[in-house]
């Protein structure tokens, strides 16, 4: 593969806007289809969603997908047809494996405050697995450490959540000004700036909503210029390479 580093600016994302939702899409999603922007590595969806108070997604189906949700502000209430329910808030990571099929709803838990969250989808190694749900508090780890592994299916990697994909993991970092982390080395990386401003070694400044897609790129550092939070997918395969 040819090594590439592609910066995608926040303003270039497609946007879905309704009376209660503003959803910014890093990849093709819903009515926004671009055949040249369907995925990177194994990552199919990276939606940056802001939901108005007392609103949300009514029950809807998913199948054969690993869905990770990360809340930036507010609280999101989850309920599904397998009997799982809970409120997700900043610092609490959630993974839902849709497997053979599941219905779930996602509602703003507040009647007065908006909720802001990022939802990310990757395919599992195999179709037809049993649907499952997992959530884990990792706020303390984010405050103590540089790069925290939020979810992973890569053998030997410790993570808060388990992914049913042996070639993918999601890392997060909450950085103070001046703090630096080293990005993982992998054939495919996807870096998303949840909030803040940072400098990417050899790549310039990044801000809220910006993303970087790495293909077979050299390791490099990422330094926060102000309080910042980033989400980084490490992927050792691309769509079509993973086990089925």
Curated annotation (Swiss-Prot):
Single GO MF descriptor: quercetin 2,3-dioxygenase activity
Pathway: Flavonoid metabolism; quercetin degradation
Keyword Metal-binding annotated: yes
Top EC group: oxidoreductase
GO cellular component, one term: plasma membrane
Family matches, as Gene3D superfamilies: Jelly Rolls (2.60.120.10)
EC number: 1.13.11.24
Keyword vocabulary terms for this entry: Dioxygenase, Metal-binding, Oxidoreductase
Cofactor(s) it depends on: a divalent metal cation
Cofactor binding summary note: Binds 1 divalent metal cation.
Residues that coordinate or bind a divalent metal cation: 60, 62, 104, 106
Catalytic activity field: quercetin + O2 = 2-(3,4-dihydroxybenzoyloxy)-4,6-dihydroxybenzoate + CO
Keyword Magnesium (UniProt): no
Residues spanning the signal sequence: none
Family: Belongs to the pirin family.
Function: Putative quercetin 2,3-dioxygenase.
Record's protein name: Putative quercetin 2,3-dioxygenase Rv0181c
Record organism: Mycobacterium tuberculosis (strain ATCC 25618 / H37Rv)
């Amino acid at each position: 593969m040819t090594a590439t580093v592609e910066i995608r600016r926040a303003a270039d994302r497609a946007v879905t806007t309704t009376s209660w939702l503003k959803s910014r899409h890093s990849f093709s999603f819903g009515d926004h289809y671009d055949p040249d922007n369907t995925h990177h590595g194994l990552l199919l969806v990276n939606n940056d969603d802001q939901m108005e108070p007392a609103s949300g997604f009514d029950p809807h189906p998913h199948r054969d997908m690993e869905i990770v949700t990360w809340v930036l502000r507010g609280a999101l209430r989850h309920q599904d047809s397998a009997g799982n329910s809970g409120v997700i808030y900043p610092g609490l990571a959630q993974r839902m494996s849709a497997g053979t099929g599941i219905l779930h709803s996602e509602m703003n838990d507040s009647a007065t405050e908006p909720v802001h969250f990022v939802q990310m989808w990757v395919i599992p190694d195999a179709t037809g697995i049993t649907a499952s749900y997992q959530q884990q508090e990792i706020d303390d780890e984010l405050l103590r450490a540089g790069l925290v592994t939020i979810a992973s299916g890569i053998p030997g990697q410790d993570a808060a959540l388990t992914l049913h994909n042996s070639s993918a993991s999601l890392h997060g970092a909450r950085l103070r000004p001046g703090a630096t982390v080293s990005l993982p080395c992998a054939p495919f990386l996807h870096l998303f700036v949840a909030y803040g401003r940072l400098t990417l070694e050899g790549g310039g400044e990044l801000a809220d909503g910006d993303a970087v897609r790495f293909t077979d790129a050299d390791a490099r550092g990422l330094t926060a210029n102000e309080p910042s939070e980033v989400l980084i997918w490490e992927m050792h395969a691309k769509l079509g390479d993973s086990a089925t």
